[in-house]
Structure formats: structure tokens, C-alpha cells
């Protein structure tokens, strides 16, 4: 029997330090995964501290609920349900929010999840296997134009149209139902290859992001987090590809600038609205040692912002 897939938490010490944890504070881990960040946060909290950990993956929630720590509340929901779940728990504000974005190693390494072209498995890709369409189900009905749009917008795939046509041609002879089948279709349709990268990498990324609505979830949770952060509370986001990082970077940049007002408004400087966030340091990437030990960390980017007293 093979060992269970292991998840190596990226930027573990750096992310926990960036949260500037108050021992008695309330914190949110937006993606519990296998609990690396959550355990490190709990280690910094005293008996009055509290951690709310979200995850869409039922298996991640099983791991979280098995931890014998009364300070931890595990929530089986996407992090876009942030405000709703805080209301349910009777929490108005929190002291820090950590978002470790993207897919976890166990999800990639467990063949049955259908997220990787390294295995032959049902073409699923859902983070929450208890709800929603699988990629195979979506591909069965999607038009060439729809498939092209997803591959282009979420995978930045140059050969999106050629791949979409190849998928449509292949499904005429039967459903595109397995990861290997899809990978072979893409491999034949891609005319040039990027060094060190499988031709299906961008397509698999695009379909996974789309089927899980990852970018939409991120765009929803960022403003919700700022609304609920106490002044001085930190928002820490770790992204793993340019699409995620672009959203985080733009949001933090925009929220760290004063609101745009008509220039002729009769307001004194002290009366002008203040920005809601203050950027903390520069973006941070894993060091050479971490990348050598965990090659999947190489694309990670961490950004940090602190809630000001600016009006919500």
C-alpha cells in the first residue's frame, strides 16, 4: 500500500510571522489543507485565542476535525463564505486572515481526484467532491468557443482554440472522461512545447481553476476579509500563479490608496477618507533552500497588508 500523499506547507514560518499574531486573538485560515499553517498559528495562540479554518475539501475537514484542540473550528465551505460563517459563529471581527491559495499536494498526488495528468483517473478536478460538475461533465456539453475561452483566460494557453477543437473532435467518438485521455488530446494539439513543462500543464490548470471558480472565490473573499479585520489586523495571501497574484496585488494596491474623490470637494486633509489597508513590506518568495526541498513552492508569492482605521 502506498503512503498517503503528503503536503509540504509553503512559506510556513514567513506567513505566520507576517500575521503578527496576538496570543488571545481570533484568526482565519482560509484553506486548512493538511493543517500546516493552522497548527503553527495555534502554537502562537494562548487559551483565549481562536482559529477558524475553512476548506472545501471534505478530506481536509476530516483532518481538521480530528485535531483535539477546542480553539479550532473547522468549516466545510469555500472561503468566500467567510462573512456568513463568522456571523453564524457570532464573530464580528478577526485579528488576521491567511489565504494559502491554489491546490494542495494531496489533491494533486491522489490519482482519484483527477487533477493531474501524471495519473490515469476519472476527469474530476473538483476540490469539493460532494458537489458541482466534474470537468468531464462540463466538457461533454461545452462548445468549442466556451472551451477556448476557459483555456485562454484561466490557463493563458496560446493554443486554446486548437485544443478546444481537438477535444470536440475526440468527444464525437465518445466522452472525454479520463485525465490521460485529455492529456493525450492536448499533447497532439499543442504545436510547440515549453522547456520543462508538459504540454497539458496549462490546460489542466485552466480547467481546474474554472471548475472550482477559484478566481471568483478569491475576488469575493478579499473585500470580505478587509471588512472584518480589526485595525492592525493582517491579511496574508500566498498565490501560486500569475492570475491569482494579479488579483491580490491589484486589490491590496487599490485598498492602500485613498479613495478617489472629486477634486473640488470642500474637504480639509483631515476630513479625507483614509485607505483601508497599509502594505507591509514587499512581496516575498521562497528561498533557494525551500525550493530545493519542495519544488512546487517555486512559483509562490506572498503579499501582506495591514488593516488601518479607515472606514469600511
Curated annotation (Swiss-Prot):
InterPro entries to which the protein is assigned, alphabetical: RsmH, SAM-dep_MeTrfase_MraW_recog, SAM-dependent_MTases_sf
Pfam families, A to Z: Methyltransf_5
Ranges that cross the membrane: none
UniProt-annotated binding residues for S-adenosyl-L-methionine: 35-37, 55, 79, 100, 107
The organism's taxonomic lineage, starting at the top: Bacteria, Pseudomonadati, Pseudomonadota, Betaproteobacteria, Rhodocyclales
Protein name stated in the entry: Ribosomal RNA small subunit methyltransferase H
Family: Belongs to the methyltransferase superfamily. RsmH family.
Organism the protein comes from: Aromatoleum aromaticum (strain DSM 19018 / LMG 30748 / EbN1)
Enzyme Commission numbers on file: 2.1.1.199
Localization of this protein: Cytoplasm
Protein's GO biological process: rRNA base methylation
Region named Disordered: 279-312
Catalytic activity: cytidine(1402) in 16S rRNA + S-adenosyl-L-methionine = N(4)-methylcytidine(1402) in 16S rRNA + S-adenosyl-L-homocysteine + H(+)
Keyword annotations from UniProtKB, A to Z: Cytoplasm, Methyltransferase, rRNA processing, S-adenosyl-L-methionine, Transferase
Keyword Transferase: yes
Enzyme class label: transferase
Gene3D superfamilies: Putative methyltransferase TM0872, insert domain, Vaccinia Virus protein VP39
A GO term, aspect molecular function: rRNA (cytosine-N4-)-methyltransferase activity
Main location per the UniProt record: cytoplasm
